[in-house]
Amino acid sequence: MALLLATLVTTGVGCSELQARHHARTGNGHFLSGDYPAAVREYEIAEQKYPQGLHVVELNKGLACRQMMVPGSKSPEQQRAVDCALNAFTKMKELRPEDPRGGQLYVQTLFDADRFDTLIAMYEGDLKKDPNDMAAINSLINVHSRADHWSEALKWSMKRADLQPKDAEAQYTVGVMIYNRLFQKGGADKAAYDPRPDPNVDPKKAPAKTPPPFTLGDLMGTERVRVADLGIQYMNRALEVRPSYREAMGFMSLLYRQKAFGYLDKPAEWEVCVNTAEEWRGKATQPVPATQPANAPQAAPETTPT
């Protein structure tokens, strides 16, 4: 009787799995024809028929749900499609943990759905286990950049650079990031303004100069100088590691230019920044000195004519 029961149970499970696979194949047909809602319905029936789960069903269900997502949408239908995909990829990871696609598609779906809070919590959890987890740090930089969390993206970029002090590009990246921010926040239209008095005009008769205005949200004054100095600090680090780093020299010039815009009401300080910017621009554009190949034949010494 016990043997018969085991056989019946095994046979029943086998039939359930066969039925599930039949519905999965039907779902695949709908998927290929572009009817993604119908495909999802068939995959859900397959799940009901075989509750133990088939990883391929969850994979295809998740992909079908992703096809119903609309970039940038916040509608209820979008949220249902996102949740459907995430749940399917979560089950796939549980059923087939050695298959990297489950985890990769789960993360990609979070990115595509702008679920940045979930991603941030996930990577910060990784950092609690290992504060120097470079993969988690790089992921946080990516997430915060996508979410336009500039301060957080900068914080983690600085963390990466501090953990890799001998990586010139890590230092350079922080400097470039800061330059871009300065340019976007009030630095695009100030280059033509010179706050110094015109030496050809009598100071008593010279009209008052009006600097180009900043707008709400721009970096200005002491805050602009502070941020520029931070970028200069990291660009200096890049040049300490790689003294011939021409791109870093070029951005050093640009950073000093942006710093000068914090001194539009202080001509002397403005002039120091502009002159320093020109010095760095000159270094960046200097021709590379020609070097003789190490294995080049040496010229024979001249002989005195006899």
Predicted regions and their residues:
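Structural marker of alpha-solenoid helical repeat scaffolds
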Residues: 49-50, 95, 129-130, 163-164, ...
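Bacterial signal peptide processing site
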Residues: 14-19
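TPR alpha-solenoid repeat register
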Residues: 56-57, 102, 136, 170, ...
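Short coil/linker segments at helix-helix boundaries
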Residues: 20, 37, 66-91, 177-237, ...
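Canonical tetratricopeptide repeat
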Residues: 59-61, 105-106, 139, 173, ...
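Canonical positions in the second alpha-helix
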Residues: 46, 91-92, 125-126, 159-160, ...
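Residue-level recognition of tetratricopeptide repeat
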Residues: 53-54, 99, 133, 167, ...
